């Protein structure tokens, strides 16, 4: 983490180890400790930590004094350096962060403070105090620990150099916390802050810095017993507010959020920062919610005596009160230095709790009450040198705050004696302990009243236990925990709580919450105005008017709150479907939240801890892998998980672990139970809404994402054994990191009902999110419902002719966000089945000239295909609105923008589709062969001239089972749909705007870059099929037939996708088993060519022992038979096995059958010789091979089922079991049928 090392010297009292009387300098005078004596203890902190982040554990080591020496840099330099046994410089900790005083003095050595628990005898050492700020008011002679406000901040502003010092310290803390200390981002941000401070004397915190600082300030609050909840603080950034009415609106929203129908949530609202001390924003109330106090002429006080002065001030402002015992004071705020305004709260906003006792019925007759949410509003938030003078911080009550202090203190309600008399206690004799007895019963009443109404409160015993856990955690994580014993110890039953017996060190860290002078004392009233004269005229309203106003005001609060709560949607996709759903979700959320969308690869993981609402739409690639643009996010979450559990791994190890299939499998299981692999409890919304008192401070609810509410929609195909594995992994690990699950993860199956599942999930999660953040879902849901059914029309989409356009490769690159490369075909594709009979399928070898393209054997190439000309031409004939399909056109969308002058509309280019001809768009960019979605069918129904066509299309669109049966039976492309409904004539512009992207197709590279430089070879099976049980029209696989029809010198557009998990092992001493039937042999051709090149060109290099298992239908279609025989002759392939599944007079045999026959040898190759297994083929074959190898190894090694499963996962983790798996194809009808049946059962079972 750090490039310096902090030395902490701990004095140990031994015979000769006395403290030196010379304590000014290190050297002849050794800063308090004589290191020439027999022994001292040195703790090295910073340089020896792992992970590069804050909150690291200290690595301790003990050094003998003989191993230390003092080094003077020069005869003219009185600054000395303490050297370790290996000559390393042991820098001394400088609590000021200035690196010395510039006058030759070294920074102070931090002496650990030993703190003991008197009861348990446990000891801890606090070195965190070395980072304390110098605001202690105690002197060498006098302790000021019991002073109520030892340090009060006035209206003076800081000097720019002091601001910079604080800013540097804060930024160091912030970037350490996200493990980016000294990174380019850190350096850039520090330079930006320096320039801003030099120019203006101040600077502005980013939103994430503000959120981090607010949480850290709570964590640093030495007087707070409930700090274990610090990471769950909700921060409302209201620095944009400029008026008192805006402040009132924000405070009301805060109260609504924090109250949460009694399940209280901690939150802070932060208004604009101090500038010059003359334009401060202030909240004049000490607490946002409090009861008024009125002093009568006879000296008697009605209400709360603590608020008499402020109540009188409010009355002078013009506030009209009822002068009862329980009047809620108005909110008094001032903005930008102006005079204050007061505001009455809507009555329904404040939750109050009538007090009663479980045994004493008369207690309720006392008509006592208290409010639910405590909200401190008089303190200054000091963060990074910036002072925020107006903040409101809310949590929940510890019962003694109400029962002991508010109700029983002599200067408050002073109810102790009246209640004791009601209890029949003798109040004349203190030895009767009447005060103690009454105090206990009052606190019982408070707890009973709150708990019986499911309103969050915590008793002092639970709070004390939670603080001890926090104290222990902080000592481990930060080497100390500032704690003010006088404030931490509860006001009753003190000695029976553990905190009473715990020694504590009180010191102050920044960021912090500080006491500040009351606005009543510091405010400068505007000329000609006086607080006593500043009275506001009030209108009288009848009941109906008040009711309407309250309802309207509540709606305003809800809308304002929605603008402040950010919702982030993340997606990971291979085909674009997840992105499509994510964008629909963002549009839906935008009706109630400040919604943003990111691809996982573009998301800054350091922001995730500060998210309020996180929704994830994630697809699974292959048999459980994350999509390429989700891999880094998966690794980042895994790193966060390891960091949280105290484990640390090298980045390379982390990458392998986080991207291995076993990693995804192990973390995607839905049967992990209540506890995940970390032992961390998964929190969902049902848990969070229980309102349990003890759960509020339960340590099990914490984690780095404990303030994040999340939900996941996972996309996948049930044809794969690891269905939706990546989405399940994201859902599980977010929960394990402490996130609050809004609702159970939903899945969308590509085989059946995916769109239906999403359309069901999206409104549900939207409604729950609104409820969670106290927004009105009824008001917004009706508007938001249109987001999922938004219809483009001829009024909002149009085609416009343009002159400028981009080349095809540039357009493809932008459209797919991939670097498209233009290559050419070396020669016409070669048919690899020269001897096949007419009924066999064909496989071709495609040779591409790819100059300057780097790849490794095992990598994939993505081909951008083209749709068939006859389909494109047929669709164009049925479209309207475009006269010339070969004219360059730009698709434009009518956008609405909210401005100060109202709604502004303008035509803007489509965010995705390029400028090109309609023919090119349908040929190269849009998917016209996949059966249309139900949403598209709904649109097509609106374009029909015939009522029967319209009704039939609407039935398909609205009835899920009818649609699925039609889709499965016909598998129609768009031309066939338009032919089936001939009256459908859609406008071209609206039609193309509805279509999905034509996705690239991936193929394993079949050539070695060393043997065929500047070439890429592909082994491609030509796909053709007929729907309707073989009786329908012939359909053609888009890409395979596109490749088959290429001719020499034709242009082709592609990109290479690295597949590191399928690369050849660098350790060529280990044997290799290759298993791949049919075109699964494709990557193995690149392997044997590579080994052949190594053996031929690099004489001294060895190649591994290689066994190849290949399967096909008949001998006539044995792919690359001659090449394989040649490789056997060259000694590249040691053994080649051929499985034939349809050869006459030979039993049907598959590759796994041959593997079983060689069980003993395979077991030895894997278990004893530590060999590698490579499997390439469709998902069904891959699963059969996996189970076969599992069976072989279990039988030979006599292992249990559990042991074998663990070993197979270990093979993956060691990167010795490699898979390159195809999706299901239409020719595997039985698999498709089974998967579809499973998907329909899953859909039917969902509520």
UniProtKB/Swiss-Prot annotation:
Q: Where does (6R)-L-erythro-5,6,7,8-tetrahydrobiopterin bind?
A: 146, 487, 500
One Pfam family of this chain:
NAD_binding_1
Q: Which CDD domains match?
A: NOS_oxygenase_euk
Binding positions (NADP(+))? 1073-1091, 1170-1185
- GO BP of this protein: nitric oxide biosynthetic process
Q: Which residues bind L-arginine?
A: 287, 396-397, 401, 406
Induction trigger: Detected in the midgut and carcass soon after invasion of the midgut by plasmodium. Early induction is also primed by bacterial growth in the blood meal.
Which cofactors, if any, are listed as required? heme b; FAD; FMN
Record has Zinc-finger as a keyword: no
Annotated EC: 1.14.13.39
Q: Where is the FAD-binding FR-type domain?
A: 795-1065
Cofactor binding summary note: Binds 1 FAD. Binds 1 FMN.
Write the record's keywords in alphabetical order, separated by commas: Calmodulin-binding, FAD, Flavoprotein, FMN, Heme, Iron, Metal-binding, NADP, Oxidoreductase
Name of the molecule in the record: Nitric oxide synthase
Native organism is: Anopheles stephensi
